[in-house]
């Protein structure tokens, strides 16, 4: 089985077999599987957060660009924003029990699966093109620099 292509930026991996939700500084990856989308935190979010200690996830209906939960790390507490509208049909209990699995491997550690309401969920805030990802992450890195 071939490994999915990815981009490496400053030691952080960004697999090209998924999409990235960038609204509200979300740093959420999406992996569509028919009308189900698995989502998780990307490598940048995991790196910036430091050790992730706790996840709180709401169950049930979610709306695009609205918070569906939060996570707490050694550095801050942050909201989790949904890239799509739909219904959370599965929560990854392994991540709730051991949140640091996201620090170890953010792309094998999905947080929730959402059954989407509308397959036409694409927006300017969901990117998948290699050049768009590079531009976005480099911009995010610059935002974190202290002058």
Predicted region positions:
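Elongated periplasmic alpha-helical coiled-coil
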Residues: 83-85
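Short beta-strand His + acidic residue motifs that chelate non-heme Fe in jelly-roll/DSBH
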Residues: 71, 78-80
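Non-catalytic terminal segments and appended small domains
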Residues: 1-58, 64, 77-78, 87-147
């Amino acid at each position: 089985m071939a490994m999915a292509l990815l981009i490496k930026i400053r030691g952080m991996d960004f697999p090209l077999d998924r999409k990235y939700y960038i609204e509200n500084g979300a740093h959420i990856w999406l992996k569509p599987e028919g009308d189900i989308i698995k989502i998780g935190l990307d490598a940048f979010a995991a790196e910036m957060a430091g050790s992730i200690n706790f996840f709180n996830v709401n169950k049930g209906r979610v709306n695009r660009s609205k918070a569906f939960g939060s996570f707490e790390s050694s550095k801050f507490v942050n909201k989790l924003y949904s890239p799509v509208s739909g219904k959370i049909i599965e929560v990854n209990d392994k991540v709730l029990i051991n949140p640091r699995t996201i620090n170890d491997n953010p792309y094998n550690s999905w947080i929730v699966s959402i059954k989407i309401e509308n397959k036409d969920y694409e927006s300017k805030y969901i990117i998948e093109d290699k050049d768009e990802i590079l531009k976005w992450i480099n911009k995010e890195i610059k935002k974190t620099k202290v002058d």
